[in-house]
């Protein structure tokens, strides 16, 4: 039986994950060195990420795994001096920035529940918009969108009214208005450290995560 831990996520969900193996960590480093963020995303999804986890839960989960199975601190080298920064402090900041924005809209009798996007890598704005769709109610038919495979998702989307996507775009703006940049590493001028802030809705979020999986940063 493999060792595993249960992680409580900012949304209130819990997930049990198995220990990261050395071979898996080496694969992560290879994806990182080749800047293959799509491949890295697919790798993380196969290992750890459930389809129903939103983007903030995913950031939190991947940093928690880094803290637990690799090292609890991140070492930053400044002027030949190594400075340790706690990953736990980053997790605290992500958790404190979490806002529940789930909302329901109705267009032409179709009721759609929107929430923080269940995505950790996207190449187009359309990918981001679609990832906010959580649940669809059409008459007596109830659809959990996150549980559908890609082919069925495309079929469902093609039958939704065009007016819906204007409402989804407005919801994305609501997310951006409520979830601002999160400063994970505070500026320390006396030590020569620049502050590091990430947008929790940024398309380069996975690039940031990949850098965190290195044990030392320059």
Language model features with spans:
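Long C-terminal interaction/binding lobes of large macromolecular proteins
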Residues: 1-218
């Amino acid at each position: 039986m493999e060792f595993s831990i249960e992680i409580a996520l900012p949304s209130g969900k819990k997930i049990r994950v198995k220990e990261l193996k050395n071979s898996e960590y080496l694969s992560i480093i290879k994806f990182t060195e080749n800047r293959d963020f799509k491949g890295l995303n697919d790798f993380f999804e196969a290992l750890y990420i459930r389809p129903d986890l939103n983007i903030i839960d995913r950031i939190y989960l991947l940093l928690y795994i880094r803290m637990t199975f690799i090292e609890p601190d991140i070492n930053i080298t400044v002027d030949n001096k190594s400075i340790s920064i706690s990953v736990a402090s980053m997790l605290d900041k992500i958790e404190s920035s979490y806002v529940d924005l789930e909302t329901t809209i109705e267009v032409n009798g179709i009721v759609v529940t929107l929430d923080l996007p269940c995505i950790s890598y996207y190449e187009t704005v359309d990918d981001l918009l679609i990832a906010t769709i959580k649940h669809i109610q059409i008459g007596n038919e109830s659809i959990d969108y996150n549980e559908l495979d890609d082919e069925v998702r495309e079929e469902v989307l093609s039958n939704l009214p065009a007016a819906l996507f204007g409402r989804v775009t407005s919801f994305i703006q609501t997310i951006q208005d409520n979830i601002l940049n999160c400063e994970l590493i505070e500026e320390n001028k006396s030590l020569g450290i620049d502050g590091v802030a990430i947008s929790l809705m940024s398309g380069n979020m996975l690039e940031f995560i990949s850098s965190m999986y290195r044990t030392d940063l320059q």
